[in-house]
Amino acid sequence: MTLGKEGEPMRRYAVETIVDGTTKYYFIRDCETLEIVLLPSKYLKHKIKSKRSPNTVKRSAFSICYYLEYLEELSMDIPQVCGLDFEKQNEHFVDFLHWLKAGNHTQENKIRTINNGTCNAYLEDVFRFYLFAEAQDSRIGSLKVLSYSYHVAVNAVGVQKKLRYQSFKGYLKAEERDVRPAEQEEIITLLQACTNCRDQLLLLLLAETGFRIGWC
């Protein structure tokens, strides 16, 4: 294992970008071999080609990168995870959520606590990558812990489309937001801090509709 600053272990994988014209592509590099990790990078390119938003692709890139670090710690790879039985596979992904929650995905893990919703969103990105990997090569195998449901949506011209979405029983429980009604003095302080009439008007509208501290 390579040690970095103050003896901390260096991350095995890193998210990098390359710009082609006006399009930014994301890929994942193995920092030990300096090679591009092909399957995840192919998936990220697919998302760009599919016109997914840059922010969505960026988050997917980091989600997968974090997951690859998690696999590195376990000395496992994608096919091995697919080969686990239901119970072990479920445990694997629940442990990944707790690994994220503990801040192990970042070297600045003492700065702030990651919330449950963000952990769940990272895992959702990982599941989408698994579905892509399975579609690319059936020999990789498929996940046993995902259950699938279908929803029929109708577009603007009345054409029905059957949409499939996956669910996982092990997601972290949603946290209650720490909000409370804003006091009058707090609203006045915010109004006085505003530099233009537009922001003052927006604050007044929020105050009328039940402004909560913790929304901002």
Which residue ranges define each predicted feature?
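N-terminal core-binding DNA-recognition domain of tyrosine recombinases/integrases
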Residues: 39-55, 64-157, 189
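A detector of helix-start/N-cap boundary segments at the beginnings of structured domains
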Residues: 24, 174-178, 189
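Basic, Lys/Arg- and aromatic-enriched nucleic-acid-binding interface segment
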Residues: 180-213
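Short, well-structured alpha-helical segments
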Residues: 57, 61, 123, 200-207
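Short, compositionally biased low-complexity segments
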Residues: 33, 99, 162-165
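Basic/aromatic DNA-contact patch characteristic of tyrosine site-specific recombinases
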Residues: 1-61, 65
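Flexible interdomain linker/hinge and immediately adjacent N-terminus
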Residues: 142-184
